[in-house]
Amino acid sequence: MDSTFDARASNKSYLGSNSIALTKNFEDWNNEAVCEWLSENNFKMSDIEKFQENKIKGDHLEFIGDKILIQMGLSIYERLSFKSIFKKLKNNNKIKIDSTDNYKNECESNSINNSNNNNNNNNNNNNNNNNNNNNNNNNNNNNNNNNNNNNNNKIDTFNSSIKQLNFSQEANDPNIKAPILDINQYKLIEEIGRGAFSIVEKYENKLKPNEFISIKRINVLASEKEMIVKEINMLYSINHPNIIKIIGYYKDEHYYYIATPYYKKGSIAKIVKSIKSKNNSGFSESNVRNISKKILNAIDYLHSSNPPIVHRDIKGDNILLNDSDEPILADFGLSYLAIENNTNFKTACCSPFWAAPEILNKSTSDFSRKCDIYSFGCTILEMIVGSDPWGGKRNHQSHSPPIPTYLTLECKEVLNETLKYNQNFRADSKQLLEAQWFKETSLRNSSNGEIIFSSEDIMKEFKKNGSTIQIGPVKQEYKYKEQFDIENISKWPREPSFIDPKHKNYKEVLNLYDHYINHSPFMAKIGPYVLDLKEELNEKTFYKSLAISSILGKIDKYEPTTNQNLIPSLFFGFINFVLYQTIKHYPSKFRIL
């Protein structure tokens, strides 16, 4: 076997006591040798197992980049470590190959000379050769020992630097006020977003499973370091319930890593698109108002800061929902401190369908807080219509996107104030907070003056008294006032599952659904509020398959049972789920008695 590539860095080995010898050429290594090499360089067993599972061999190492390492599940720290030790491996490998070739050439030359001498003095030269060989062997042994000692020292130094990486000054930027993130505590799960100069990834806490954070990785070479430091410090200084908070940061040679909470529900844009795909509309006006008011409060907080902070990219994609359905304004990558930059700030910003005219047309370099107000108005429309406010076709000559005629007068007033073409005539955040739309508990329809009640009013009554279902003209009533948990009602399936027509209760459930939906009236009463259930269920035809699959699934869960009222009870439980969804998303469908 060829001479060993490296001495052991420690007594602990991936293979235990039966440690293998690493040849000088790493391309000849099998998977076992690769794992041994990683072990010598203090890789964690869990990460070594990933190389073992993927059967990584020596000739693969040259081609393993970030994409493959991410797919294998290595953390940022381990990815950087791998790149560093592989670079060292290649350098050492080249040195050893060169020195070995020189040694072989020297030996071949000596052998030729010795052979010539042997023709003259066989006995003496044989003795001399033997002595020389012994001396050479001793020298080789000494050289090998010295090489081993040098390699041990190099590896010890390398391993020591790796262990201390999180505590070195390279991981710290004295200009940043935020705490340093212990990056080695997290493992990469998946990529969740990508921008021009940054990537957002989801990470899981290794010590606390199912605890996730988002990490925004910003390319230092592609972005100005000064701007990155400003973004981190700005985020860290902000303290508002509807603005994203920074957990910490980490820095290496190539990237800054900004850690924030992970919101599993995702963005407003994602949610509203999902709703539109099913109902051909966005959020109810009541829901839009509630979200908009909280985001406007966040905008007012930013604009009232000293110096003022302009977000410059407000849109549904940059508004997240937390577990309590509270909106969180995020992605401050385009933000700037207005006072420092208001004289010559000409950097392109904002998505075109949400951008203020003065930004899009580059008619001015004074990008004031009013550009956020325009984008805010576009975001209100986005939530209402379920897509970008221009329908994918913005006419740059138009002053504002079209406003739906069915909106209340109060909502139209806010949109008109936010979407004025000339920024000098746009309302500011404090003026908008005084708008009637953000104060009313009930809304007035613009077409006929009918009162539309907010979802909060109806939901409060629903939680307090439940519902009463009226079936037929003789006022058969089914009172569903038993103590129930709104959370359980809200967790009914939202998508129908497979329906087995051979299920023993299939026909009974189907006939029950058809029986009730064909009655007139088929109404639900929640205190003074009334909903036409027949109209609602006929309008949303998917409710039928959803009801049947959900009820059959719950029957299987509750079996065996002797309760003959189980199926009617489950049906009216489903009706309460329908009421819950209508209250949340379409409160305007209720009327008052």
UniProtKB/Swiss-Prot annotation:
Domain SAM: 29-93
UniProt xrefs under SUPFAM superfamilies: Protein kinase-like (PK-like), SAM/Pointed domain
Active site: 313 (proton acceptor)
EC category: transferase
Residues of the Protein kinase domain: 186-438
Domain of life: Eukaryota
GO MF entries: ATP binding; protein serine kinase activity; protein serine/threonine kinase activity
PROSITE patterns associated with the record: PROTEIN_KINASE_DOM (PS50011), PROTEIN_KINASE_ST (PS00108), SAM_DOMAIN (PS50105)
SMART domains, sorted: S_TKc (SM00220)
Reaction catalysis annotation: L-seryl-[protein] + ATP = O-phospho-L-seryl-[protein] + ADP + H(+); L-threonyl-[protein] + ATP = O-phospho-L-threonyl-[protein] + ADP + H(+)
Binding site residues for ATP: 192-200, 216
EC number: 2.7.11.1
A Pfam family of this chain: Pkinase
The keyword Nucleotide-binding appears for this protein: yes
Disordered as annotated region, ranges: 108-157
Record-stated family: Belongs to the protein kinase superfamily. Ser/Thr protein kinase family.
Protein name: Probable serine/threonine-protein kinase samkB
Organism field: Dictyostelium discoideum (Social amoeba)
